[in-house]
Amino acid sequence: MSKNTKSKNNGIRKYNAKTEVKLVYFK
């Protein structure tokens, strides 16, 4: 379970990074 949660958190972190970059570009 911890392994699954870890990969999930990594995916969320990558997704957040992508959205943050998009927001910065749009500003």
From Swiss-Prot:
Induction field: Expressed approximately equally in exponential and stationary phases (at protein level).
Pfam families recorded: YqfI (PF23690)
Superkingdom of origin: Bacteria
Protein name in the entry: Protein YqfI
Organism: Escherichia coli (strain K12)
